[in-house]
A protein has these predicted regions:
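Paired small-residue
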Residues: 6, 77-84, 92-101, 289-297
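Helix-breaking motifs and short loop linkers at transmembrane-helix boundaries and internal kinks
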Residues: 34, 66, 87-93, 231, ...
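Helix-to-loop junctions at the C-terminal end of transmembrane segments
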Residues: 55-67, 251-263, 347-348
Length: 404
């Protein structure tokens, strides 16, 4: 494994921790600031929207510097945002800190995906992307449970200071292990934007929004759901998050392994099963053992979609993939924001803490429908397939997916 992939995974670990740890600390944050749980949920949706906005903007700005330098600048921004969150005296300032940190998220994973894919042979690209995202999934096994435990025992502010420390480690890893590379020449912004004329790119991003939104509809409010519905103690949430993280690690690795050879079948299975499991979660959430098993499955099925969705975007926009890759990361978080908002609506309407699971099931089923439409169009020749898209785009711009 190239050491540069390890550096990217380290950065992903820090980013993944700050993205997900807030879900285990919503009650503590809500209590300190005197806001409701749905209002505290804006810390999730605000972060997600920051990723959506920041992904294209930061990526475009990053075309002026080398990829390594841009990755380092993004980690610096991430550190600053988490320090602001940790020290924020008001809810508004904490939300601002979350947004500042989130601006680095999409561009880091977008640029990182292109770098990771270029480090290996073409038939191993999904595996390389999955290796980088392993840092994100491991954050849910180690970083998020540890951060939740620290937040519940010593205060949530300490958690965000620790996350800032993770950012420092990630910055050092990128500086040390990612090789210096010149700024890519010959690919202009119009070539990057042209990728969005490919309907398959847009369909893949739609799958990303809806599929990952299904996951977040359930897990955004996992703490009140498990404590008030399943009857778990507050301290048990840490271990439930470990199970969620283990599922994510397994799903990510499986998705990366099979996406290179069976991309669309992988999406069919993972999205279809995710919709079913989320619907069942409305029932299993009332039993501790069944809830724990279901949470693990949601993590696994949700993250099994990440490598194939990211690879599909890279394939369809292979001549100029940097912006499309980053925007697709934003699409993951647009799904997060949509799910957190819809989940808060159904909870606020009095349908209970299990109601977001129905929202998640509907979103995942909609993503499956888009996958069917995408594959059908591709087989009928109504839209360019991956190879044709690569040839067409490469005719106007040299490929960015190459060894660094």
């Amino acid at each position: 494994m190239p050491l540069a992939l390890l550096a990217l995974a380290i950065g992903a670990f820090g980013i993944g921790t700050t993205e997900f740890v807030i879900m285990g600390l919503l009650p503590e944050v809500a209590t300190e600031y005197g806001v409701t749980i749905p209002t505290a949920g804006h810390l999730v949706s605000g972060y997600a929207l920051g990723v959506v906005i920041g992904a294209p903007i930061m990526t475009i700005l990053g075309t002026r510097v080398s990829r390594k330098r841009m990755l380092m600048l993004l980690m610096g921004l991430f550190i600053a945002g988490n320090v602001l969150s940790a020290l924020a005296p008001t809810f508004g300032l904490m939300l601002t800190g979350r947004v500042v940190a989130s601006l680095a998220h999409g561009a880091f994973f977008g640029i990182g995906s292109v770098v990771a894919a270029g480090l290996v042979a073409p038939h191993k690209r999904a595996g390389a992307i999955a290796m980088m995202f392993t840092g994100l999934t491991l954050a849910n096994v180690v970083g998020v449970p540890l951060g939740t435990y620290v937040g519940q025992t010593t205060g949530w502010r300490a958690t965000f200071l620790l996350v800032a420390g993770l950012g420092v480690v990630g910055l050092a890893g990128v500086a040390k292990l990612v090789p210096e590379q010149p700024r890519t020449k010959g690919v202009r912004l119009r070539h990057e934007v042209a990728a969005f004329r490919n309907v398959q790119v847009l369909l893949a991003m739609g799958m990303t929004v809806l599929g990952f939104g299904g996951v977040f509809a359930a897990i955004t409010y996992i703490t009140p759901m498990m404590t008030k519905t399943a009857g778990f103690a507050d301290s048990s949430v840490t271990w439930l998050l470990v199970l969620l993280g283990l599922g994510m690690v397994g799903g990510n690795l499986i998705g990366g392994r099979y996406a290179d050879r069976h991309l669309m079948p992988m999406l069919y299975v993972s999205l279809g099963a995710l919709a079913v499991v989320l619907a069942l979660f409305t029932l299993t959430a009332h039993d501790k053992i069944a809830a724990a098993v279901t949470i693990t499955l949601i993590g696994g099925l949700g993250f099994a979609t990440v490598p194939p969705l990211q690879k599909r975007v890279l394939d369809q926009a292979s001549g100029a993939p940097t912006l499309a890759s980053a925007v697709n990361i934003g699409a993951f978080n647009l799904g997060n924001a949509l799910a957190a908002w819809l989940g808060g609506l159904v909870i606020g309407a009095g349908f209970g803490y299990t109601a977001p699971n129905w929202v998640g099931a509907a979103l995942a089923a909609s993503a499956l429908l888009l996958a069917v439409v995408s594959h059908t169009l591709e087989r009928r020749g109504g839209v360019r397939d991956s190879e044709a898209a690569a040839t067409d785009t490469a005719g106007t711009a040299p490929s960015l997916v190459r060894p660094v």
